[in-house]
Structure formats: structure tokens, C-alpha cells
Amino acid sequence: MRKSLKCFTVLLIANIITLFAFAQTTTISGNVKNSSTGEVVSAASITVKGSGAGTFTDDKGNFTLTTSQKLPVTLVISSVGFEIQEVTVNNSSEFVQVNFKPSSTLGQEVVIAATRTPSRILESPVSIERVSLAAIRNAPSPSYYDAIGNLKGVDMTTSSFAFRTPSTRGFNGSGNLRFNQLVDGMDNQAPALNFSVGSIIGLTELDVESMELLPGASSALYGSGGMNGTLLINSKSPFKYQGLSFQVKQGVNHIDQYERTIAPYYDWTVRWAKKLSDKFAFKIGAQLVQIQDWQGTDTRDLLRNNVISSLKPGGTRQNDPNYDGVNVFGDEASASMQAFGQAVRAQLLAAGGAPVTGAIDAYLNAGLTPAQIAAQFAGNPGLAPYAQYLPFLIPTSTAANNPYKGLFGAQSVSRTGYDEKYLVNYNAYNLRLSAGLNYMLTDKIEASFLGYFGTGTSVYTGADRYSLKDLKMGQYKLELKSKNWFLRAYTTQENSGNSYTATTSALYVNRAWKSDAAWFQTYTGTYAAARLGLITGVPTSLPDSFYHATARGQADAGRFLPGTPEFNNAFNNAKNTNISAGGAKFADRSNLYHYEGQLNLTDQVKFVEVLLGASARTYSLNSQGTIFADTAGKIKINEYGAYLQLQKKLINEALKLTGSIRYDKNDNFQGQFTPRISALIRIAKDNNIRLSYQTAYRFPSTQDQYINLLTGGANRLIGGLPSFATFFKFGSNPAYTSQSIVDYRASFASTPNPGLLKVATFTTIRPESMQSYEIGYKGLLSKKFLVDVYYYFSKYKDFIGRAAVGRGKSGDPARAPIDLASPFTTDNLSFVVNSPTPVKATGYGFGFEWNVLKEYMLTANAFGDQLKDVPAGLVTFYNTPKFRYNLGLGNSDVYDGWGFNINYRWQDKINWEGTFGSGEVPAYGTLDAMISYKLKSIKSMLKFGATNFTNKYYRTSFGNPQVGGLYYVSFGYNVF
């Protein structure tokens, strides 16, 4: 017993000693300053060499580090823009003062996007661009998101101030389905749209640490959508970037009062982050932007055909009765006067009016004038009630001796529309809120919860101009990560708010005071009556424009004028009534749920670097019938995928080979494999050639699959899944191509020819795919001169587009020639199709960064993209200038805290093709500039800046607003 007690006592003492030994920790404190300027360096990394322990300097450059290692220990200090430094600490009571030596950052930035693992940007196996925290801080653009537009290979499409869409390597547009945008690893797309809504949801400006851009194919690692690029936006860690920061930015736009009076611009941002202990930190942030948006003012005339509408040169409301203004809405309602007259005649005959038409034929054959025929009708009690139809019946009479046949010709007329400024909400704002909780479970495992919420009012250009009023989106993520693995789950919650369409709301207002049928009857009847001499005092020898003006004036009698109570009431009713109920409002509450994991086995597999990952997501579509065919309930779409990447360095690390492959599956489509192979060849220190073969794809978007949306002009967009062909019974009730219907109606000017009608074929959609080959070089020709060059060749297959068709409202195929003669008895449909023709594209880019003198940085890049061997008549929506370039010069500290930055961009003209309209977008150049002053003692910066400094208006795409100058001053506290 005594022996056992003695053993127990020994073991207990040993355990106490062991615990005490482990409890012996050392706390080290210090400060880091820039050795050149004496300024404190915040967010510098401090780690204990050979240990996982580490911390970051706070906003005053101070740090406190606790370690269980015995003294002496070696601290490793690192930060972008400084040389890595090691300091030995022998005494814990010693305050460590580090004088950090600045170094050139050219080519030394660490990027993750290229391979999902950290590497120097010089050693990336594929093309990549990076925007650093310092570049964001010193950019003249008012938003960090706009700074992307100065990168090599990037185009920006501006639908409105807060809705800008970056694109690379072609296929520009408002909302890019071939471009991924990830914020802290979360796909930033709106679930109902399948593309990112600009920067309406995402990081506040003071919470952005960096942005990384992969131009070109990136599906091998990032999945569907990465056909033309992937953008990664990374936030600041609350462990690394601490303290209170705020920025107040105010300015003006519309200074020349070209579109409206001078308007104020406000942008207020705040961020607070705190490390409460070595294990726990948090951050919160908010940003509010308010501005009077750029306005859509293009009044050029469109020739509309439901899918690709083109411009009519010189057309105006005054000289074109069928005028359809680009940024004018409500004039999409159009009808052929001849077809309308024929419809009136057919209705009369169906009601037993053969004696009436027979009498007219007889009078015309007898040589009576229209006035004489009217007198005959007035004197005959049996014919008198039908006198009102004479303007329709005389021009459509089949009498052999009818000099008035063809009076209407092939002329169509449209209703009088409303300018965009009366229909779209230009009171743009964007409120972003963010919060994050980070907890270190161990020295190597971090748990985090992040939430980003955004709401705002903006405008988006798709098949229509959509007023995104009070749009709301939230993204919420749980993540566990370590050095070599992560697990994350997140959701995107979308709420369309009070969003609505401009065209549908304008049509609603017009129809509120007079139906389309009544309006066209008044117009056609008045026009014909005037031309036939049936209106007293109106001669028949006047120019045709006079008769059209007379007809429009008569038809527009009682029209609601903008600003009147009648207009406002009708407009409000349109905005507050769901599209599915005949209004213009969206009612979307679609969500996305995503799960993802990644594991790096490089430490376990010694002979090759191994990376693998998998993901799964679910779309939950819920638009209450305002976008999707979901009136019966929510629609679920599941996707899952997995990827594998292998990397191997050979020949004394002069050659690095990377191979990756990904497989993805969507519920509605066959699985897709996307391999990628690349080689990085070191030809000298910090000089590398890269070669790559990449593949990419995109599944048809949620709208491509399930849309069922009634748009302007009674046109319905439908999805491309087989269920739509079944629901709409295309097999038993065929639809006809839009162009054949146009040709058929035009034949009514002489002899109607139903043989012109061509049946359209509904085919099931397939995913798009592409293959790309690239060669590039990136290297330092000196420590102060970085060059990057690339050339690529790509081949695209199974382009997704739309085909316009129509069919009779009666549902009886035998009546198709009768129904299709009039727009009032025709249902217009547009369904998704794949192009059978592959398309080839080539492109190149060249850029350099040159530290010419002290801190002066000169940058320049030029790039071009174009399609090859495009068959005549194929619509590609490529929408890309053949050539563009960027020039920049800046210095953040010219003298005593003063700095500046100037950027100039020029791009070639574009032959734009879009569902909203098609036409030439002129070439333009724009100058952005800013002057800054650092208040170093309080780590603050004052900026005076301007974008489009010369205020020369330009347009980035067809139908979008012209962008003028924005001038601002800002003050930022604790921003460097």
C-alpha cells in the first residue's frame, strides 16, 4: 500500500512539473517601423521561426506574441513591400524594435487564384493580374471595383454607376455569364441571374485586402462559368488588420447639366476590427453610397425583331411612324396597318358582313370615290352602321378596280412611348454591411463566420432596362481552415425588392388609358380616312407625314403625361403589380446553398504536389412566376463537382508542370470534364515562360433553363429544357420563325403568301464549352522593370443564344395564316438554342511596370481580342474592341506626403450585338486622376480625384447610359 502511494505521489509530482513546464510561456512585445520614413508598419506578420505561433502588428505598429518555446527565439518579420527580416530575442523583458527595410514589390506579390495554392506572381503557370491594397488606396477611381478596369485584358461594361461588369477575352455585356466572381471564396452571383450584380453586395472598400484576376479559362479549378475569367476579391483578416478606420468621400457629377442639374455624390465607409485575444478577433463594417445615376438618353431608332434589333439610320419619331427609341419605352407595341385592316375585314366577314364588303367592291368597280361611297352608306339604313369601317375596308377591298389597294403598304406603326428618365429610378444608392467572427481553435486551425449584406437601387441592361430598386442580397459563410485544408459552407439569399422592367411598366401605363387595339384602330382609321378624303377640310395631296401626324394626334388624345396624377397612378400600379399578374414587378426570393472542401497533400506525398477538392450546390428558384416557371412551387437545381491538381518541379526547379482536371454535374445536363495542363519554364532568375492548354464550360444559366418571363411587346422568354416544348405543345401546335412572320405580313401589301411561313425547331440546350492554348512570358528585366506578354487561341462550341418565334393565339394550327397576319392574334416567344457553328478567337496582351525614379511608377498595357472565321449571319455577342490600351503614372509620396496618380484608357469602337439592341459603340478615351496628401501622424489620407476628368461622355455598350465626369474629395483615417 505504502509502495503504491509512493508511486502515485511520484507520478503526481511528475505530472505537476510537466504541466508547470508546459505552462511556462514567454511573452514578447515590440514595434515595427519603416527604416526609410520612420512610419509605423501595420499588418506586418510576426512569426516564431520553426513554430506555428504568430501575430500581426496593430495599427500603431505594435505587436505582442506569446510562445512556449524557450529563449532565445528567432522572430520572422514579413510584409508586402519589405524585405523579410529575422530578429533574435534573448530576453523576454526586451522591447523589440524592428526597423523594416523597404524593397521592390515587382513580381514578388503572392497570388492564390492561379493554382489555389500560394505562389509568387512571377511563377504563376497561367496569366494572372493582381490589385494590391496599396493600389486600391492610391487609385483615382471612386470604387475599388472600378480599379479592375485598368488591368491588362479587362473591359468594363457600365449599366449604371453601381452596376459595372468586368469581362476578359471577349463576350462583354451587362452581367457576364462566362465570368466568375468570388468574394472570400463565395460565388458572388445572384441565384436568379447567374452573374454578379456589380459590387452591390460584397466587401466594403476598407475591408478589401487584394483582388486577383484570372483572364481566360478557369473552369478546371473554379467550375461552371469560368470560360472567360475568374475574379477573386479577398477581405482583411481581423487578426492582421486591426483598429478603427473610416473614409468620407463626397463629390459631384452632372456638372455640365447635360442630363440633369448638378448632383451630389456621397460615399461613407467605416470598419472596426479588434483582436480580443490570441484566439479571438472580430470585424464589422458598413458603406453607404448615394448618387444621381447616369441616364439612358439614346433616342436612335430601332428595327426590332425580338432577338437582335438593329438601328434604322436617321429614324426619329417625326419621320418614322414605327419609331422604337433605344431608351424610349412603350413604343415596342407595334402593328402593321395593312394587317390591322385585314383583321377588321376578317372580323366583319366572320360576323356576317359579306353584304357590306360586297357593296364596297361593287362601288369601287363602278368608279366611285371614297367620299361617294361614304355618301351611299349614309343614305342606306342597312349600310350606315358600317360606315365607320370604310377606312379599313376600302384599302383592303379585293375589287378588281380598287385604286386604293396598297394604301397602307408595308407600313407598321408604334404607340407613343416614354423616355427612360420617366420610368427608371435614378436615385441610386448602395448600402453594404459586413461582420466577421474569427476563432483560432489551435495554432493552425481557424474557424470563422462571415456575413455580407447589400441593398441598393441600380439599373441593369439585359433584354430590357431593369430598374433594380431596393434589391437585397446576403451572403453568409461558415469556414474551418488550416494551412493545407479548408471546409466551407455558405448561402446566398436574394430578394428582388421593388425591382421592375422599364418596357413592361411603360406598356402598362399606355394600356391604362387606351388599349392597344383601340389605339391602333384610331390611328389606322384616322390615317386612312385622311388619305381617302373622308375627313372634311383635309386634302388628299399633302405629304404622307402629315397624315401620320394627324393619326397620332388623334390616337394619343387622352395620353397620360409624365408627372401628372394619372401617369403616376398608372406607373405605381405597374411597379406594384407582379409581372405574372400583368404588371412590371419582379417577386424573386431565390437562394443558393454551397458546400466545398479542399485538401493539400503535398506534405504527405513527397514526390509531387497534390491538391484535391469537391463541392456541391443547390439553387432554390422562387420568383412566384415573375421570372421562372415556378408558379407551382420552388424549383431545385443541384450541381456537384470535384477536382484534382498535380504539380511537379523538374530540372533543378527550372521546369514546373501543373496538371488539373475537374468534373461537374448538373441535374439537367450531362457531366463535364475540364482538364488543364501548363508548364512554367525558368529561363533566368525571375524570368519565366508559361505554356498552357485549358478547357472551360458553363452550364446553361437558371434562366436559360427555367425562365418564363413576359417582356415588352407581349414577348415571352421561355427556357430551353424539354419540359417547355411539352408544356407549349410545339409538337402539335408549331411555332414559326420571327423573320418568316415578318416576311409574311409584308406580303399583305400585295398578295398574302402563307407559303413564306417557316416552322421553327425546338432543340434541347447543351452546355457551352471552349478550349484555349496560351503562351506567355513574365519577368524582371531589372529590379525596377517588369514585363508581361501573352498570346492565346481559343475555340468555342455550342454558344447559347435565343431564337424568336411566333404562333397563333387561337391554338389551332389550321388558323395559323389567319392568326399570324396580326400581332394582336399572335403569341411571340423566344427560346434558348445552341449555335451549331464553332467560333475561334485570338488575342494578345503586353504590359510593363517601371519604377522609373525613386517612387515614380510608370505602367502601360495594350491588348486586343477578335473572332476568326465567323460565318456570315452568325450572331456571337462577342462585343469586344479589337484594340485598347491603358497608361498610368503615379507616386504615392512625391514630397512630404504629397502623391498623385493618373490613368488614361482608350478603346476601339465595338460592333455591339445584344438582346436589347445592336449597333456601333464609338471608340473613346477617358482620363482619371487624383492628388493625395498623407497625414502620417494619424495614418490618414486626403484625396482630390476625378474620373473622366475631361467630362467627355462615353458609352461602354449599346443601350447603356453615357458616363460623364465624377469629381470628389475624400478623407480616410487609419487607411495605411
Predicted regions and their residues:
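N-terminal periplasmic "start-of-domain" segments of outer-membrane beta-barrel proteins
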Residues: S29, S45-N62, E109-A139, R164-T165, ...
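N-terminal periplasmic accessory domains that precede
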Residues: F95-N99, Y144-A147, R164-T168, F179-L182, ...
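Gram-negative outer-membrane beta-barrel transporters
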Residues: L650, L786-W912, G972-N974
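Conserved C-terminal beta-signal and adjacent last beta-strands/turns
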Residues: A273-K279, G285-I291, A428, G474-Y476, ...
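Extracytoplasmic beta-strand/coil segments of soluble accessory domains associated
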Residues: T66, I128, Y145-A190, E209-S210
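Short acidic/polar hinge/loop motifs at secondary-structure boundaries
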Residues: F63-T66, N188-P215
